[in-house]
């Protein structure tokens, strides 16, 4: 239903991520041109063993492997664990990189605000900086750290 609503409103499916997929939904999502994301959860929804089989069957185009750290049983390290399992099961490194990293970066980076350099070359912390004239501070002295480790 959500894909139909997106299409009815003229959204470009190649710019829409449909998450929480499984083996039963992935084909329809990909066939309609959307990006299929899979949140890997232990014991529920999508597991990493099943994710390996999805990538073997459908390839790495328009597929994103993600994880969660929410109120239920979840594993924030599910993506690297799934990537490792993919490699062990013979999936090519380039396909692992695409599904577990690059595809997400490509789509979420289209807004121009999320760039790989943000975490590959992080800046030091400077709490004296303001965002829209607002600060995270509540009366305390700003923390300013350099990128240097002394």
For the regions a protein language model found, what residue spans apply to each?
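Short, small-residue-enriched loops and turns at beta-alpha junctions
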Residues: 1, 23-25, 42-46, 70-74
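A short, acidic, amphipathic alpha-helical segment used as a generic capping/interface helix at domain edges
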Residues: 47-56
């Amino acid at each position: 239903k959500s894909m139909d609503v997106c299409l009815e409103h003229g959204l470009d499916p190649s710019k829409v991520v449909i998450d929480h997929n499984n083996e039963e939904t992935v084909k329809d999502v990909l066939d309609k041109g959307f990006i299929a994301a899979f949140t890997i959860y232990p014991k529920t929804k999508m597991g990493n063993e099943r994710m390996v089989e999805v990538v073997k069957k459908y390839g790495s185009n328009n597929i994103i492997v993600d994880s969660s750290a929410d109120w239920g049983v979840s594993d924030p390290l599910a993506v690297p664990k799934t990537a490792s399992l993919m490699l062990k099961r013979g999936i090519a490194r380039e396909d692992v990189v695409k599904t577990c990293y690059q595809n997400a970066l490509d789509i979420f980076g289209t807004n121009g605000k999320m760039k790989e350099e943000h975490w590959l070359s992080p800046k030091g912390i400077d709490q004296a900086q303001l965002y829209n004239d607002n600060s995270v501070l509540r009366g305390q002295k700003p923390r300013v750290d350099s990128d240097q480790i002394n």
